[in-house]
Amino acid sequence: MSNTTVPNAPQANSDSMVGYVLGPFFLITLVGVVVAVVMYVQKKKRVDRLRHHLLPMYSYDPAEELHEAEQELLSDMGDPKVVHGWQSGYQHKRMPLLDVKT
């Protein structure tokens, strides 16, 4: 019997390859999520600050708006206006594309 061993070629360990691929992927994903959360919080703060700044300038009252809309409708009913549809305005203006004189 022979006491010799056959040298094996070095093979890449599959666990180390997974680490090389998944490590950067998870790192980039984590950085992206952190950036998205920071941007969301900044936007929310900016919108809240703008809302608190504009709120004292404007007070919304739906009843007041409804009353104003009714007044506009009533005032418009007193003024007779002629409103043409889009088809009636174009039908009488049809002209030939080429004006040929014979």
UniProtKB/Swiss-Prot annotation:
Glycosylated sites: 3
Keywords carried by this UniProt record: Glycoprotein, Membrane, Transmembrane, Transmembrane helix
Topological type in the membrane: Single-pass membrane protein
UniProt KW Transmembrane keyword: yes
Keyword Transmembrane: yes
Coiled-coil stretches: none
Transmembrane segments: 21-41
Subcellular location: Membrane
Expressing tissues: Expressed in spleen, thymus, prostate, testis, uterus, small intestine, colon and peripheral blood leukocytes.
One term under GO cellular component: membrane
Full protein name: Small integral membrane protein 29
UniProt lineage: Eukaryota, Metazoa, Chordata, Craniata, Vertebrata
